[in-house]
Amino acid sequence: MITTTETEKANSITERERCLNVAKRIVCTDRNEQYGEPEDNFDVISEYWAAYLNSKYKVGVPLDSGDVAHMMVLFKMGRITTAKEYKEDNYIDLAGYAACAMECAANKAKIVREISEKINRENVDISPKNV
């Protein structure tokens, strides 16, 4: 069970605020201390999952860190849907994975933007005949 801090008790915060506070504490401190940056960890997981899917189904499935974060959100939704009883940590984990997914998407968008700017700045011809 996730414990409520004394500050949270004193401030009479809402459940949604407490959920986000705990998720933030877990994702931004506890998790990083144990596993490192989520995106780095999810990149490794994506390689394992892609290799498994390729081996099992004989198809190349490109996965990235964002895919792992999204699938972990779905995993948590499945847990919530089939749980015999309410467990708050499922919702806290769900919020944490959603935050990680957002960070992965933002980082990917930044890389795409930087590449696009470089192509435009250097007038690189990326038509199929020149690639």
Question: Positions of the model-derived regions?
Answer:
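Intrinsically disordered, low-complexity regulatory regions
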Residues: 1-131
